[in-house]
């Protein structure tokens, strides 16, 4: 290959890239089945809403357009031997019951997990190993927008395209 772009976020340390600068967290979410009209009335018949924590690992609760409740209130350092999916679902159940005791009987329709990567100082990683290998990651839960920005900047860097996007990304303080 002429140039390589490495964008594996939480797996950067597994490739010996900035090995001591980040660690993976696993976040788990659950979503209820659709609430009935009666169940919606019990919780005040709300319009769709969402509450997101200012911290990437904080709780997220949403009431969706199709009358479901989505909750994420778990974040765990990812060690396969210590992660317990069922414990996370129990925490979701407890959170739902505390926030919405009127509908604590409602089952979850689906649950899932995903990885994020975090650094000690909350900053991402971006750079190159040499003139042919470029990397980016550790978005600290910054979401799709931040990862897309860094992905595009990796391409700009690999193609030696100096532009405002690359300047923005290169101005970030580096993770430590």
Where are the model-predicted features located?
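Active-site substrate-recognition segment that forms the wall
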Residues: 1-38, 42-130
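C-terminal lid/capping helical subdomain adjacent to the catalytic/cofactor pocket in oxidative enzymes
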Residues: 129-176
